[in-house]
């Protein structure tokens, strides 16, 4: 079923998507946002996540100046591609008397490319959301393994390390990840997000608190000591840094719901630009301060550099609890897609358990948090954030866009594909290389 564009010379056929559940776990079905400030705040909440904790380590690898340039470039490109999605939906809505039937990224894929478009979007949403959750488990396992004193024979880490090495043949980090598994089976068996919604507020508060503590600690350390730092780490690390930057700004799934809920839609682009600019400044400050404070000793999770004080321990435990409860929120769109395709949209506990097990197994084999951020950013986030928005925009506007617009969309598609392929290869090489 489709609507023909009769008011335009374009022969594009709009495919009306069937009713579908939202693909983004970040937004509920609450009342429409009525102010620009609320939209700004929601952009911040949707984009800023645990990936920020890996930025200082990424700056150590790439050099602080290259890191800044990559963050700014990715921020500008991400905003542009988000707006391409908005423009594409507005164009398709104009074919249907201005009534929007496109509520999510998957709906837009269906409207532009039919079932194939939805399948591609769904696939990369599954990979990206599951990738985020793998990162969460890596963070939890690594952080808990580092919190206790390994030299103390009575410490929890010592007992876990001895148990793992002598009896099970696995590390304490792996045991902590396995320890999360049965509890995640229970949390991910909850049918609706309604009961988990308050946890998203808690997660945002903990994230902001952790960032504030780290920035203060970094500033105090910088005043006492200034380790040697480098501006450029070499072009060989460009793809690595690009992957981490793309991961850090991933939030393309929220842009269409946010634009729909904003009262003054004409100002959405400006509000989104302000939000992305503000986030960029925070990311740059966080990354530079962390690197300046610890130099070559900067760890892949910056909170691990804070030492063993009470404040540091509370922050790290708070982040672990935050990510532990954020896990089911981020897996929810994966469950919706898989259940829609394999159980006719009906709730399926065993499908959810299989997916949680798969995510857990992947987390066990990834040694480094920041390296995995680069992998997810280079692979799925590049496709979702750059390739698909530009491709959909190109297909819908191809008969009325000028040469400059056509070249811009085509260049973004090509750039996204090149970054995805080369960045994925580079990240996998980093993960599986033997580091001495």
From Swiss-Prot:
A molecular function (GO) term: neutral L-amino acid transmembrane transporter activity
Would you say which domain of life the source belongs to? Eukaryota
List, alphabetically, the GO terms of the cellular component aspect.
vacuolar membrane
Under Pfam families, the record lists: Aa_trans
* Primary location recorded for the protein, binned into one broad class: membrane
Q: Any keyword Membrane? A: yes
Q: What is this protein called?
A: Amino acid transporter AVT3C
Q: Which organism is it from?
A: Arabidopsis thaliana (Mouse-ear cress)
